[in-house]
């Protein structure tokens, strides 16, 4: 167990000025970060089910990449008994466990040096539709992770969650208007100003804007639940053939955009369709295990924003969520077809979905750089 004190060196320049860029997820990784789930007003049974699931996710990742887990001091002893022994536990305060959204975006340069971008965070909407209050500890998470690795830090003047962007490492950024242009994130910035900031801090050139994310996604339509890059020039889209499903118009509109765009290198996109599970709904038993607090209520009968697109690429592995016995095998087969050179590892992940996200949402990769 190690301790991360907040003291990452802050830079006054921007990554693009310094020759740094965000690499694609399939670039070599030195580590993956996760955070211990414990909020009783978001995770049933005070997080016990989620903790067991996080342990399985950490174990699956650990077969390919070292795993770090931020854990509040009060839960360190418990985490040590639950987490696989190969996971490095780091004492770290947080308001919840969404490492993708509160962790840093690590950027690299041609020499293999790593630095981190620390974005603003307001719990997916602040006092205008945000998911909990306060979020002050979450605002310190990125800095603590960067300190652990000894990386210098860029502080970006933009409210942004890591789950709201995907890049191909070759100049293209994909995102959703539902999230990035939402009035509860950066109401004083225009679309053009947001793009300029993403150019500065991700060093990208071209943007692919999808309108909406997955139906009922409480993050306001994060791209990482809806669509991702498989490799340069190829994307994977969350899909349903059921035209009566509320998801259909969202996926169809996204497909129309993807079919009529090019990436930063001028390539037309090859589009893979990954079928949605379910539809899936929260049960009464699952909702009763969540206590009342400042978190968003978990209501029986509420549709869950389940998506197989919410997977992690980590070195030679794809770690994806198992969500529905009727479609899990189809998703695994499709992923193996898309990624023949990768080991496809499924982890039962309904407990993460009940809390509002999935495997990509609870992980944040640290690229190797070199």
From Swiss-Prot:
InterPro entries, A to Z: Agmatine_deiminase, Peptidyl-Arg-deiminase_porph
Enzyme class: hydrolase
Active site (record annotation): 361
EC number: 3.5.3.12
Molecular function in Gene Ontology: agmatine deiminase activity; protein-arginine deiminase activity
Keywords of this entry: Hydrolase
Pfam families (UniProt xref): PAD_porph
Family indicated by similarity: Belongs to the agmatine deiminase family.
Stated name of the protein: Putative agmatine deiminase
Native source organism of the sequence: Shewanella baltica (strain OS195)
């Amino acid at each position: 167990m190690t301790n991360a004190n907040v003291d990452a060196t802050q830079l006054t320049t921007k990554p693009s000025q310094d020759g740094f860029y965000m690499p694609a997820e399939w670039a070599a990784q030195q580590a993956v970060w996760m955070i211990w789930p414990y909020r009783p007003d978001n995770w049933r049974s005070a997080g016990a089910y989620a903790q067991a699931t996080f342990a399985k996710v950490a174990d699956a990742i650990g077969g390919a990449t070292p795993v770090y887990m931020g854990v509040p001091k009060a839960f360190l002893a418990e985490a040590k008994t639950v987490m696989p022994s190969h996971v490095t536990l780091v004492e770290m305060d947080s308001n919840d466990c969404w490492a993708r959204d509160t962790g840093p975006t690590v950027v690299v340069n041609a020499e293999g040096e790593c630095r981190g971008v620390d974005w603003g965070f307001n719990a997916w909407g602040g006092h205008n539709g945000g998911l909990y209050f306060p979020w002050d500890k979450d605002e310190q998470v990125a800095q603590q992770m960067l300190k652990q690795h000894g990386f210098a830090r860029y502080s970006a003047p933009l409210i942004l969650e890591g789950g709201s962007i995907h890049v191909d490492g070759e100049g293209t950024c994909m995102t959703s208007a539902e999230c990035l242009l939402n009035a509860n994130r950066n109401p004083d910035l225009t679309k053009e100003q947001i793009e300029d900031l993403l150019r500065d801090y991700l060093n990208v050139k071209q943007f692919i804007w999808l309108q909406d994310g997955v139906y009922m996604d409480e993050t306001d339509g994060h791209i990482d639940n809806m669509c991702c890059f498989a490799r340069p020039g190829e994307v994977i889209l969350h899909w349903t053939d059921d035209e009566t499903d509320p998801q259909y118009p969202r996926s169809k509109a996204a497909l129309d955009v993807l079919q009529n765009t090019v990436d930063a290198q001028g390539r037309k996109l090859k589009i893979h369709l990954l079928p949605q599970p379910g539809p899936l709904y929260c049960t009464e038993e699952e909702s009763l295990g969540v206590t009342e607090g400042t978190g968003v209520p978990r209501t029986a009968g509420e549709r869950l924003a389940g998506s197989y697109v919410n997977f992690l690429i980590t070195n030679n592995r794809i770690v994806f969520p198992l969500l529905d016995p009727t479609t899990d095998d189809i998703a695994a087969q499709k992923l193996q077809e898309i990624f023949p050179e990768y080991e496809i590892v499924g982890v039962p992940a309904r407990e993460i979905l009940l809390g509002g996200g999935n495997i990509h949402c609870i992980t944040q990769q640290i690229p190797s750089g070199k």
